[in-house]
Structures are given as structure tokens and as C-alpha cells.
Amino acid sequence: ANTKNREPKVSSVFLCFSIFYVTVLLNCNHVYGQTSTVFACDVAKNTNVSSYGFCDNSLSVEDRVSDLVKRLTLQEKIGNLGNSAVEVSRLGIPKYEWWSEALHGVSNIGPGTHFSSLVPGATNFPMPILTAASFNTSLFQAIGSVVSNEARAMYNVGLAGLTYWSPNINIFRDPRWGRGQETPGEDPLLSSKYAAGYVKGLQQTDDGDSDKLKVAACCKHYTAYDVDNWKGVQRYTFDAVVSQQDLDDTFQPPFKSCVIDGNVASVMCSYNKVNGKPTCADPDLLKGVIRGKWKLNGYIVSDCDSVEVLYKDQHYTKTPEEAAAKTILSGLDLDCGSYLGQYTGGAVKQGLVDEASITNAVSNNFATLMRLGFFDGDPSKQPYGNLGPKDVCTPENQELAREAARQGIVLLKNSPRSLPLSSKAIKSLAVIGPNANATRVMIGNYEGIPCKYTSPLQGLTAFVPTSYAPGCPDVQCANAQIDDAAKIAASADATIIVVGANLAIEAESLDRVNILLPGQQQQLVNEVANVSKGPVILVIMSGGGMDVSFAKTNDKITSILWVGYPGEAGGAAIADVIFGSYNPSGRLPMTWYPQSYVEKVPMTNMNMRADPATGYPGRTYRFYKGETVFSFGDGMSFGTVEHKIVKAPQLVSVPLAEDHECRSLECKSLDVADKHCQNLAFDIHLSVKNMGKMSSSHSVLLFFTPPNVHNAPQKHLLGFEKVQLAGKSEGMVRFKVDVCNDLSVVDELGNRKVPLGDHMLHVGNLKHSLSVRI
């Protein structure tokens, strides 16, 4: 029973709890989820509430919260430190379930949200790894906006909460990570832009008032969390040993952007330790960075059962009361779980934590609910009160799910006269493979019930007549069933083979040990390709990269597409690309490594940078020195695109004060904290020409290589833009480059520096040298 978020430890205690949980749900669905619209300050039920300051929305959030917490007993405050917050009936405050999920659509994972005959499903978008491949920030926000509309609609009929523990913005550091599919990939800039964009889509109200929230998003899992269960190493006890340079250069930027640029309402701390300290009990990470440096306006929540984990699994404290006190004093406001509810009272009695710290924590929680309008009375009279079942799974929302999948799909190989196929010329199409008729597989994890499914087979059959053979009994493919598949491929005009993974191969609590196609899938692909009469298109459905070197070099396999987990409309999107209704424009958001990489690099080594002394090859395109199967940013379209730099400086002079030490010393870099960084920016203008006849979206990726100082990245994404180009047309793209933000690197101590010397800018095959001098 996977009832706990991020699938917690399977222990006898957990199994007992699961049985209890299911029993309670069956007998009384009022316990764990909203069953009618839940809100405070209901004048119809209790006229006294109109006299309470916390119900007066003409007051500031701060004043309202202050009025509320003064009225609460210590026990009532403690009852509001857990995800299943208790009711305070004397003040007209109902119980509230904080835990809902919306990773790529409203999900019924977590007790705060469920479906019913009133709303049987919600729009399931592609998994974030595929959405990220679109390199389209406006798409990230558009999806968030649709998801929050559907969430509000479900809240209004008592089926959902207002607090969503999404997105997952951890860096996809290692190809084996089972949860990489949930993330925007391996690059800090792309992940940062995704975080801010998706969060804005979820949270922003129509009037743009940043003090109000449409729904409350949550960026997780803070921080350096990317090992679940690898060769017996569990996330509950894993100590991520991370250098200050890697922390500030790789792992922290998405969270910083989420808080500062996205103005997110919540951050979730992770299970793992970082350099010996559990993240949920690290005051430097929580109070120091999230609240202090980044100024979070919202609440900090633990990953589910993390407070219990740091006592029971990590043995970080001697008692449960100590665990409760340590986390609250470190800056935790809300516990996904029951530990704070059970043990905070005892911690107060033992003098381990003071009531003021508890008041501070619940104040952050209540402030979030105030911003959501939870204390403004009847939601039907509030903004978004008109949303309801009619606004879920609308044709427009379902079309956006299809469009998101199309924009993300990546074309990795395309021989002449392969794709696109002509629906007029193809009279028979063989559709083969364990994911060829996938439905549930397409929506990945943290999923909801979709509006409907279109499998690859259904999508392709809408274009041409098909014959189908799965070729494997399941995705694990222990025994390939090649005969039927080979037979239909031998006579068909073209063959589509849909292979890859599913949640039995890569998932939460399940990291891969190899990155080859599972079981006998490779044998199936080779043998079918060998007898195929026409072009063979290999379609890979997966969250992580696969070593498909064999398919790259096999001339019989004429095209390769990676489709991630493409969501409810994935099959339609795949067919749109294969038959040329849509020109592919996705680019890989992560490196695809050879199998040899995972054979020699332990998943537990957190170092990003290569170490020539030990032969350690480094991680991600920014630092990895070895061979790749496919590289970050790879992706083709059906035509070619030419880039041309129209305007870019060759020299940038940094104005330094006369007495600056670098005027006399041989400085290799300048500190970005100094005054010389203010307003130091320039523009780069690029022309982008579509040489093909077919209209196309195109992602322009601007990289730079800094001078070789501070063990800097060998290449780094500086910016990206999606442009729409008609056939044979030209467009202009402008990048505004802030020298100290965009051309800086993180030094060995975690400080940002601008390297002096020659920086190389790259776009496609173009290179432009830019000198930064004093």
C-alpha cells in the first residue's frame, strides 16, 4: 500500500499503519481527505466568526495570523504542525489535509485529493522530464496554470485541497535515478527556469497580487537528493557528501530560483543527510538559506516521515522528542506525518523547544492558508469560486497535454527517406513492442486518473491501417516473442517499435543498476529490424537515458525517437510526429551515457567534477569528459536550421574602482558581490533560419565555456528560447546577458566569481569569442 508520499520504508509498523489507513478510508472517508468544500470563517455556520480579526480580509495577512495564534492553545497549535491538521471548532476552523500532489496534473496520490463520479479524472500532462525537453518556459507556466484551474475546480466541490507538494526540481545527476523522470533534467539553469515557470503557473492569481495564491506550490526535495534505493543504499540513511562548490553550483540553483523568481509558497526538505546532517534538522539550510538568504514567504515541510526517519533510521537524536524539537528549531513548520503531533508536547515539557518557536511554525502555515483565501469564508463567493467539474478535462486542457508531448518529443536519429512517414504512401504499418499499446505507462508516477488515454497504437491507427504484436509479455521482457513481430514487420510498409521502461524498471524507491534496454528488448529490436521491409522507427519510452548504441549504428533502424513518459495524449503526439503533422523540436534535457559509465561510477559519489587522478569521469554535460550515446541538447527536426550571430560584443570591460586590488594584482576572477557588477549587461542578437519547407518550432540553446579557472564547467547553458518558424523563414532571437549572473562561475569556497579572460559562446555549430577584461 503506497499511501505515504515518496513511498516510505516498508516496515512492520508501516504495514500495520497501511492496513489501518485503508480500513479507515473504507469505513469513514471523512478522516483523511476533504469530502465537502473546506474553509474557515463560515458565517452561515457561526455568526461569531465575523468578529474575529483573523476572518477580516481587510487586515494584512500578518495581522490576521497574529490575531489567530493568540487565540490558540498550545495543543491546538501542535495539532496544526502535521499534514492532517486538526479542527479548532470553537473558532470555526475545520480540519485540513495539506498533502496533495500535482507533479504533472492533479493527482490522487496523497490523501488531500480524490476523484469521484463528479470529477472522474483530470488532465495528465507528460512527466516533467519530457516537458523540460521542450525548452519552452511559456509551456511550463501554461501547464501549471491549467493544473491549478483543475485543482481549484476540484476544491470547490470538496475533492481537493489547495496545497500541492510539487514540483520536484532535484538535479538528474545520475542516469540510474528512478525519480529522474519527475525532474526537469540535469542542468541547473533549465531546472531553475522550469521551477519558476511551473510554480508561477500554479500560484499566480489573475490579478497578479503576489500576496494571494491560486494554489500553493512546493519545491522539493531540498537538497542534494537523488539516490532512492541503489544496491542496498537507501535514501533514508544516505549521507550525500557534497562540496560547497557543487552545492552552490549544481544542487541549490533550482531551489533558489524557485523561491526568489517563482515566489514559491513552500519548500520540502528531503530524507537524506547532507554532509552528515539530516536536511530537515539543518538550521543553516532551512533558517539560514531558505528563510534568511532567499526570504521564503511560506512554509517549510518535511518529506513524509522525515522527522521519524532522523530518529529511527539515522539515529541523529536519542529520543523522538529531541527529533521534534531539533526540526522545529531548525526551521521546519509542517510535518508530513504524525511525529510532531505526537512528540512536540513532550518536547515542550522537557524544555527542548519553546512555545514561541511552535507559534512561529504554525504562523507560517496559517499565513499560507490566509493567502489562499481559506479564511475568507465561502469559496463560491471568492475568486475562482465559479470553477467546477465543467472546468476539468476540457477539450482545451486535453489539447495542451497533446501539444506538450509533441513539443517535448526528441528526434535522435533520422536517415534519409525515413521520417516523416506519408500516410498516403503507407498502406500497412507494423506496430511492435512492449510499450506499443501503453496507457498507464505513459503517465509515469505521481499521476492522477487521466481524462482518457490515447496509446501509441491508437494514435498510429488513426493515420493508417496497423497490425500489432507486443513482442514481449511485458516491459521487463524476460522472454521476447519475436516470431509474430518479425512476421508482421516483414510484410509492412514501415515498422514502429516502441520499447523502453516503466515503473517496474525505474521509479521512486527503485534506481536502476544498468541502463540497457530491459530484458530481451534489444534482441527484439535487432531481429525485427533485420527482417523489416520498410523503414524502422525505434520509439523509446523512458524517464532516464538508455544505452542504445546498437540502434545508433544499425542502418536498418532508420529513426530513433525518445518520448519520455508522454502523458494521457502521448500516443496521439507520437503519431503526429511520425506522420509529419508536427515537426519535432525537443532537445535532450540529460546526457545519455554508455553502460560502461554505470559499471565504473558508483551512484553514491556526489562529485560533479571529473578527477583525472582517480579516473573519475565527472557528471552531466557540464563536467563529464567521456563518450556519450547522446548528449545534452541533442535533438533534430525534419529540416535544418541555420544560426547566425548578428550582434555580440567581443570585449566587455568591467569598471573597477581606482583602488581595487585587482588593478595591481594578477586576478583571475572578480567577486560578483562588488559594486562593479551593477548594470553590467549586453545583448546578443541571433538570426535563426529554417532551411526546410515544413514549419517548425526551434529551441535556441546558448552555451558558454568560461576561462579555465576555479575548476569551472567545460560548457554551461546560458539561456534558451523557443522560436516558431514557417518553412524557409527567418526569425530573430535576443539574449540579454547579465555579466555577473550569467558569465560567473562558483569557486571552490562556494562564492560566485566572474572569470577574466576569453569566454567562448556557442549556438549550434557557431562559436563567438568574448573577452572579459578590467
Swiss-Prot record:
Residues 1-33 form the signal peptide. A bifunctional beta-xylosidase/alpha-L-arabinosidase, exo-enzyme that acts synergistically with endohydrolases. Releases xylose and arabinose from cell walls. Does not cleave xylan from oat spelts although xylan from oat spelts was degraded to xylose when this enzyme was used in combination with xylanase. Also releases xylose and arabinose from aryl glycosides, xylo-oligosaccharides, arabinan from sugar beet and arabino-oligosaccharides, arabinan from sugar beet and arabinoxylan from wheat. Keywords: Carbohydrate metabolism, Extracellular matrix, Glycoprotein, Glycosidase, Hydrolase, Multifunctional enzyme, Polysaccharide degradation, Secreted, Signal, Xylan degradation. It catalyses: Hydrolysis of (1->4)-beta-D-xylans, to remove successive D-xylose residues from the non-reducing termini; Hydrolysis of terminal non-reducing alpha-L-arabinofuranoside residues in alpha-L-arabinosides. Its main location: secreted. The active site is at 303. It comes from the Eukaryota. Transmembrane segments: none annotated. GO terms for biological process: arabinan catabolic process; xylan catabolic process. It is an enzyme of class 3 (hydrolase). GO terms for molecular function: alpha-L-arabinofuranosidase activity; xylan 1,4-beta-xylosidase activity. It is found in: Secreted, Extracellular space, Extracellular matrix. Glycans are attached at residues 48, 136, 437, 530. Belongs to the glycoside hydrolase 3 family. Its EC number is 3.2.1.37, 3.2.1.55. One of its GO terms (cellular component) is apoplast. PANTHER family: BETA-D-XYLOSIDASE 4-RELATED, SUGAR HYDROLASE-RELATED. Proteolytically cleaved in roots to form a 65 kDa protein. This is Beta-xylosidase/alpha-L-arabinofuranosidase 1.
